[in-house]
Curated annotation (Swiss-Prot):
Catalyzed reaction equations: tRNA(Ala) + L-alanine + ATP = L-alanyl-tRNA(Ala) + AMP + diphosphate
Binding site for Zn(2+): 566, 570, 668, 672
Chief localization: cytoplasm
Translocase found in the keyword field: no
Similarity comment: Belongs to the class-II aminoacyl-tRNA synthetase family.
Record has Transmembrane as a keyword: no
Protein name per Swiss-Prot or TrEMBL: Alanine--tRNA ligase
GO molecular function terms attached to this record: alanine-tRNA ligase activity; aminoacyl-tRNA deacylase activity; ATP binding; catalytic activity, acting on a protein; transferase activity; tRNA binding; zinc ion binding
Length: 872
């Protein structure tokens, strides 16, 4: 077995399959593109779904990749086991209807055992297979595997409900008896017992059948197109090749661990548990790559995952004795380890560090706040006579505030509390089950559409034409290819001026005419067929026949509106980079007829000043009437030109580069204006957050922009009339004057309210009642608003009238409740929570004063009557 670095292992895998005629697919972003079923890219095949379901046919049916992936359903196991990671790399080879079982097995055995490649000892490799899959067994024997090393496993069958399915075969490496102290041997593999001896390094899925849950598996029909999907974990391979005890004892993690040693003053040892070192090293990799790909910490979705990873890493840093912020300082090390294949971490190093540093600073403040929450919780439990900290409370502090369980338990035990360990485990298990349930299990192979996949005719889109003569080559109705269609159908022509929806640009609409110029069909939508042809969805008015020529004519006004928005999107993208920063990566776009929508990554709301500058800059470029040039070239030349690839686009060998003066240059397959002046005008109408770390700008161009400005002008004129400003230029001064007058009136009103409260107070406060050793006042009062209750409470505080004050008032349709306390035995916040339900309300506050709001005025008498009972 050869000695290799992780970079060499990755490259050798890719080189091997390249030598076998595979195209190397680049690693895609961890943030899925156009796939709502996935929170993260979680496997090597996840980015290739479109090929497996037949919606797109690849130029080469043989593919290979090294794909970064994230899985977070078992975060708690990271650091505890030898091989659990949140971010990992999957090496894979794939066949889309090309080779199958024979070649896949031969390739795997050659790569692993040949002296030209990894040169693993054959006697160290064991293979599992599906018992009924005798063909796979025979293929392994053919390539030279010892039959005693072939282990049948009933679970070796891949299927998720109805659809493509098939047996899989897994390759394991035997690390020897040193990792099998009980000498269990092959039983570990045969009975799927968790162990450190037999390490799975490669899984080959043979997508062969069309699963149908209503029939036995043995009767599943075969798929028309059989596929191969394999996955090899890079971290595991490197661990075996480099002789590491765990995946962390390799060149993928050890440089990070060495930096953690420097920061903590502690020493890492492969023979010790070292959980904190492992957690930090794993989590900083995930954070660096995910943030680099545009995901940002937040309170939901991907953002929540990143926030949780960061907080877990910080707490393990504290366990190692690291004081202050430290995580961001590890990012350059991550970048250097991975730079040979993933240069983006170093390229975005400053931005990644900025986000991590800011998030860590926020969490350190959260830790301080969490300490106060625990102190308050324990104090309340003591006042209620309880000596047990419930598991649900421990979990809430952990899950909501990121406060470490061990620290919560330690503080509670110091105060004499018993710990509900079982309750915490139940709450944690429930959360893990929710997390697993939230993961939509999407496999590599979706349903195959044979009809569309079978269309292989040549079809060309004519960028510059608005109308053209096209020959009807294929017509589809009710999912069948027919010679003549009427009603709703899908059509493919040899040439077409109709743009198929792609890259955020909506499809062209229009008409199809016959030789006499009569409209015979309306084009309602255009999409790409699996082999790339423009597939026209039409409603026919007269029958259309294959082989005949027709005039294809797009809706020119619709196209003109769409291209204005598309070109403006390029200008907006460039302006965002100039003003907000290069981290503002495109996260989606839509170029419609009426508007454009642009989603981008950014960690804060775009300020009004920034929006104004973006709008000004885009309009400046529009008015310069810059030429919009389109160049067709190869991908390498395009990148040398500095062209920026747009989010979610798949580019072939030849690409189109859209260049707008020296202001913008992007790879883009869409249609555009000829000059920027054709856009006319650009106006941002909305900026909003649509998810953790993702912002959205909606804008309009041309006539719609003029209408938006006109609407704003009309609104300003109406405001001028309302505030009696002679001219719109005087509206601001007039509104400011009115605000000053309002503030004066409010001060006078507050003063009158105070006097009113003082005049009422003698009557309200004279009815003092007793509950045990406490004196209290409980009264319904008439006040204009909640401030009236506070004014009365202020007067009560200045006098020695009672220990507790409870005031309730009906204000409009609502009920307001105030509780104040001078007694250390009564917490106002607790009492208000007990009383609020009488008026269908809720609230809270501090020990000395708390308030609540409700909606059930009929419950006021019952509330007042209950005060004595609650205080007794």
């Amino acid at each position: 077995m050869k000695t290799m670095t992780s970079a060499e292992v990755r490259q050798m895998f890719l080189d091997f399959f390249k030598s076998k005629g595979h195209t190397v697919e680049p690693s895609q972003s961890l943030v899925p593109v156009n796939d709502p079923t996935l929170l993260w890219i979680n496997s090597g095949v996840a980015t290739l779904k479109k090929y497996f379901d037949g919606s797109v046919v690849p130029e080469n049916p043989r593919l290979t990749n090294a794909q970064k992936a994230i899985r977070t359903n078992d975060i708690e196991n990271v650091g505890k086991t030898a091989r659990h990671h949140t971010m990992f790399e999957m090496l894979g080879n794939f066949s889309i209807g090309d080779y199958f079982r024979k070649e896949a097995i031969a390739f795997a055995w050659e790569l692993l055992t040949s002296s030209e490649w990894f040169e693993f000892p054959a006697e160290k490799l064991y293979i599992t297979y599906y018992p009924a899959d005798k063909d796979t067994y025979n293929r392994w024997v053919e390539v030279g595997v010892d039959p005693t090393h072939l282990v049948p496993i009933e679970d070796n069958f891949w299927e998720i409900g109805a659809g493509p399915s098939g047996p899989d075969t897994e390759i394991f490496f035997d690390r020897g008896e040193v990792y099998d102290p009980e000498h269990v041997g092959l039983k570990l593999l045969a009975e799927d017992i968790e162990n450190d001896r037999y390490i799975e390094i490669w899984n080959i899925v043979l997508s062969q059948f069309n699963a149908d849950p209503s029939i036995p598996r043995s009767e599943y029909p075969e798929l028309p197109q059989k596929n191969i999907d394999t996955g090899m974990g890079l971290e595991r391979m490197v661990c075996i090749i480099q002789g590491g005890k765990t995946n962390f004892d390799t060149d993928l993690f050890l440089p990070i661990i060495r930096e953690i040693e420097k920061l903590s003053g502690k020493t890492y040892s492969p023979d010790s548990e070292n959980m904190s070192f492992k957690v930090i090293a794993d989590h900083i990799r995930s954070l660096s790559f995910a943030i680099g790909d545009g995901a940002l910490p937040g309170n939901e979705g991907r953002g929540y995952v990143l926030r949780r990873l960061l907080r877990r890493a910080v707490m393990h840093g504290k366990k190692l004795g690291i004081q202050g912020k430290f995580l961001a300082s590890l990012v350059p090390t991550v970048g250097k380890i991975m730079q040979s294949y993933y240069p983006e971490v170093l390229e975005k190093e400053d931005f990644i560090m900025q986000i991590i540093d800011r998030e860590e600073e926020t969490f350190n403040r959260t830790i301080d706040a969490g300490q106060k929450l625990i102190d308050e919780l324990l104090l309340n439990l003591k006042s209620e006579g309880k000596d047990r900290l419930e598991g649900a409370d421990i979990f809430r502090l952990y899950d909501t505030y990121g406060f470490p369980v061990e620290l919560t338990e330690e503080l509670a035990e110091d105060e004499g509390f018993k710990i509900d360990h079982e309750g915490f485990k139940v709450a944690m298990k429930a959360q893990q089950e929710r997390a697993r349930a939230a993961v939509v299990k999407g496999g590599s192979m979706g349903a195959q559409n044979e009809t569309l996949s079978s269309i292989e005719v040549e079809s060309e889109f004519l960028y510059e034409d608005k109308t053209t003569q096209g020959k009807l080559l294929v017509s589809i109705q009710d999912d069948e290819i027919v010679d003549e269609v009427s009603g709703k159908a899908q059509l493919v022509f040899d040439v077409t001026p109709f743009y198929a929806e792609m890259g955020g640009q909506v499809a062209d609409h229009g008409v199809i005419k016959d030789a006499e110029g009569q409209v015979v069909a309306n084009v309602l939508d255009v999409q790409h067929a699996p082999h790339g042809q423009n597939l026209h969805s039409v409603e026919t008015l007269s029958p259309l026949k294959v082989g005949e020529s027709y005039t294809l004519e797009i809706d020119k006004e619709r196209r003109a509106a769409v291209v204005k928005n598309h070109t403006a999107t390029h200008l907006l993208h460039a302006a965002l980079h100039n003003i907000v920063g290069n981290h503002a990566l495109q996260a989606g776009s839509l170029n419609e007829v009426e508007f454009l929508r642009f989603d981008f990554t950014h960690f804060a709301q775009v300020t009004k000043e920034e929006l104004a500058e973006i709008e000004r800059q885009v309009n400046e470029v529009i008015w310069q009437s810059l030429k919009v040039e389109t160049v067709e070239t190869d991908i390498a030349t395009a990148k040398e030109m500095g062209a920026m690839a747009l989010f979610g686009e798949k580019y072939g060998k030849n690409v189109r580069v859209v260049k707008i003066g020296d202001y913008s240059i992007e790879l883009c397959g869409g249609t555009h204006t000829q000059t920027t002046s054709e856009i006319g005008l650009f106006k941002i109408v909305k900026e909003e957050g649509i998810g953790s770390g993702v912002r959205r700008i909606i804008a309009v161009t041309g006539q719609k922009a003029y209408e938006a400005f006109k609407d704003a002008e009309n609104t300003l004129n109406e405001v001028a009339t309302m505030v009696k400003a002679p001219q719109t230029s005087q509206v601001l001064a007039k509104v400011t004057s009115l605000q000053d007058e309002l503030k004066t009136a409010q001060k006078e009103n507050d003063a009158l309210a105070g006097k009113l409260a003082a005049s009422q107070s003698d009557e309200i406060f004279k009815n003092v009642q007793t509950a045990g050793s406490l004196n209290f006042i409980a009264s319904e009062v008439t006040v204009p608003d909640a401030n009236g209750l506070r004014n009365l409470a202020d007067i009560w505080k200045q006098k020695e009238l009672s220990d507790v004050l409870v005031l309730v008032a009906k204000i409009g349709e609502k009920v307001s409740l105030l509780v104040a306390s001078k007694s250390s035995d009564v917490k106002a916040g607790n009492l208000v929570k007990e009383l609020a339900p009488f008026v269908d309300g809720r609230g809270g506050g501090k020990p000395d004063m708390a308030m609540a709001g409700g909606s059930k005025a009929a419950g006021i008498p019952e509330l007042l009557a209950a005060v004595a009972e609650k205080l007794a």
